[in-house]
């Protein structure tokens, strides 16, 4: 977050993308395991930096009317990349998929060159750093109307007032703390509801439900992984096309409710002793859960988070959300086996159902509908002390 705030969104975004591509090449051509491991660590750092900078950058340069669509492009592209990697056999040198890998790398570096030549710096970061003329110039190039650009810059300058930034703003401003705690609560409960654990345990659940030896085969588990990622990709595409048209609140509420319903169904099915029927229903319910959870996570992580965090604390707040998300994922992966051994899948499903029910309640009572509202207006309403659910324009509760 410090790099994104100090060096700017553009440099961080391009630099992390270049670093990630370079580390990917090193991973493929690594001569030893130590080099391979180091390149994976570098790739992880680059991915985190790219995620942080790209989400902030997208929210700061796009118009309110298409901000959600543009923000959802990142998770959709991420899932598509994983799909290509999983469905393409052997990306190592000499493998069947190696030519495709080289083609994707060349496209990536071509996109980097275009980004270096054409991508402007975020006008919000320029205004926050004191480069007002440059911010106006960038806004004019983006909006093609000087009056709109000047009006937008006036709103940005209003949000730039104040000495507190980042962690200092978090410690001194109650309204900023409220929105950060809301976002962290949503992150915690979406992960506790099993968005990572349920696909991860898909094959184990099938093995427990059916006693066929086919379920122990690696190819079957791999097919389940492919199915899970494909469904998640469809969820990201659904979020992309609904988050601006229907708003943030409605897709998040519906997807959270579907998650809770499917988990409740899994709780009931887990007590069933009809193996074949249970296996079919469990598969359908898990697919529904992955789809709806993907919609929720895209609307939340890619769109809502950067919209509601104020400009002077955007990097800090976004970094906090991503950090808690990663830590919660690691804790869930670490502890889920102990939960299954102690409480069986029945206990796991029950815990996830409770978490999903709490997630529905938080979403209904606190999540605002921020589509068609500028991020400066959202910030002004936040600092004016308005209820969190009413931060968006024209929201009734």
What are these regions (language model features)?
Residues 1-133, 137-140, 160-397:
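Alpha-helical transmembrane bundle of multi-pass membrane proteins
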Residues 129-132, 146, 150:
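Generic detection of long, well-ordered alpha-helical segments
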Residues 142-144:
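Short helix/loop segments within enzyme catalytic domains
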Residues 149-160:
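Short, well-structured alpha-helical segments
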């Amino acid at each position: 977050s410090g790099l994104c705030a100090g060096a700017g969104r553009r440099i961080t975004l391009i630099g992390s993308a270049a670093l990630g591509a370079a580390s990917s090449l090193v991973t493929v051509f690594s001569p030893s395991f130590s080099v391979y491991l180091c390149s994976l660590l570098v790739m992880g750092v680059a991915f985190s930096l790219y995620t942080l900078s790209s989400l902030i950058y997208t929210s700061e340069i796009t118009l309110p009317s298409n901000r959600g669509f543009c923000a959802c492009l990142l998770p959709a592209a991420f899932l598509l990349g994983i799909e290509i990697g999983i469905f393409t056999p052997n990306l190592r040198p000499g493998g069947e998929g190696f030519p495709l890998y080289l083609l994707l790398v060349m496209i990536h570096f071509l996109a980097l060159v275009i980004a270096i030549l054409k991508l402007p710096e975020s006008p919000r970061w320029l205004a926050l750093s004191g480069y007002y003329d440059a911010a106006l110039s960038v806004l004019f190039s983006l909006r093609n109307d000087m009056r709109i650009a000047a009006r937008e810059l006036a709103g940005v300058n209003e949000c730039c007032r104040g000495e507190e930034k980042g962690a200092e703003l978090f410690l001194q401003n109650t309204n900023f703390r409220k929105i950060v705690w809301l976002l962290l609560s949503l992150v915690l409960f979406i992960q506790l509801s099993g968005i990572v654990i349920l696909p991860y345990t898909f094959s184990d659940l099938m093995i427990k439900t059916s006693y066929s030896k086919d379920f122990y085969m690696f190819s079957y588990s791999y097919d389940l992984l492919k199915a899970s990622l494909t469904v998640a990709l469809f969820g990201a595409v659904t979020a992309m096309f609904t988050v601006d048209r229907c708003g943030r609140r409605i897709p998040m509420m519906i997807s959270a409710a579907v998650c809770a319903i499917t988990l409740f169904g899994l709780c009931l099915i887990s007590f069933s002793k009809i193996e074949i029927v249970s296996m079919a229903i469990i598969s359908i319910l898990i697919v529904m859960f992955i789809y709806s959870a993907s919609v929720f996570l895209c609307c939340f992580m890619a769109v809502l988070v950067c919209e509601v965090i104020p400009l002077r604390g955007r990097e800090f707040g976004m970094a906090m959300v991503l950090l808690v998300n990663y830590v919660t994922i690691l804790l869930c992966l670490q502890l889920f086996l102990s939960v299954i051994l102690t409480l069986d899948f029945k206990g796991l499903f029950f815990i996830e159902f409770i978490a999903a029910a709490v997630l529905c309640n938080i979403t209904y009572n606190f999540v605002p509908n921020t589509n068609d509202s500028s991020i400066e207006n959202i910030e002004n309403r936040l600092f004016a002390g308005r209820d969190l659910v009413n931060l968006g324009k024209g929201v009734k509760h």
